[in-house]
Amino acid sequence: MVSLTTYCLKNIVNQHAHVENTVLLYHLGLRWNCKTLYQCIQCNGVNYINSHSDQCKNKDLFLMKVIVKKNLAVARTLLSWGASPEYARLFCRNAEEEQALNLQHVADIPSSKILERLTMSYKENDEQLLITFYLLNLSTKFSTNLHEQVRFNIVSYIICDLAIHQTFKTFYAKNYSLSTLYCIFLAIYYKLYMALRKMVKIYPGLKPFAYLIGFMFDDETVTQTYSSTDDEILECKNKIIVIKGCYGNIHCRSDIDHMYAFSQNNFW
């Protein structure tokens, strides 16, 4: 059942979403980055244009981001729209924030659910992938153990071919976050070029990695944009060529049995 608060917010945003009322909308948690927020009727996500599009944002991911950015007004709105309080509590920095959002009695969320939400569920448009990238790399809430689980989650989901394993291993040795490598991989796999450009701008040292992943998937847009002549990259590229010759095209599977089998082994 939709709450009275949700109905009120919807009525306010529909009647007052113009320039002279932005102060009111900010106080009510209906503005973010100088844009008015709307709840999408079709996908139940959040957008800026009051109609469904491929840029609708997942409410749980968006909730995590606004809490990291300390915007509790928007967080309250997203919670009233049905975003998960468990994920909100995960990103609260102290008891005061939990109390302000009425989360003090919310149970802790299992690490496995956090990983599923952050690294596997939302990877099919630029906006959601960039939010995931932001959360994985800038949040201070993740423990060492959680990052270790992220590592195994990535292994179980992506490293379904020795060529991918070799590429990840090469860059993991250079102290790049596996969660960062994972997001860049997804950007190329799903051809999210805008997200890829933003990620590589933050970590320019990963241009060769983007090139190798693009090479594995025969993506000329990526290989031409991030071409590299580095000797180490050439060596890794040659290994990919050999493996492709032996095993054919690379396939990434995500079924449960396959993921579980990989998660039982340490490939690093």
Swiss-Prot record:
Membrane topology listed for this record: Single-pass membrane protein
Keyword field contains Transmembrane: yes
Compartment list: Host membrane
Coiled-coil parts of chain: none
Keywords: Early protein, Host membrane, Membrane, Transmembrane, Transmembrane helix
Keyword Transmembrane helix: yes
Residue intervals on the Extracellular side: 194-268
Transmembrane stretches, start-end: 176-193
Induction per the UniProt record: Expressed in the early phase of the viral replicative cycle.
Topological domain ranges for the Cytoplasmic compartment: 1-175
GO CC annotations, alphabetized: host cell membrane; membrane
Protein family according to the UniProt entry: Belongs to the asfivirus MGF 300 family.
Job of this protein: Plays a role in virus cell tropism, and may be required for efficient virus replication in macrophages.
Record-given protein name: Protein MGF 300-1L
Natural source organism: African swine fever virus (isolate Tick/Malawi/Lil 20-1/1983)
Lineage start: Viruses, Varidnaviria, Bamfordvirae, Nucleocytoviricota, Pokkesviricetes
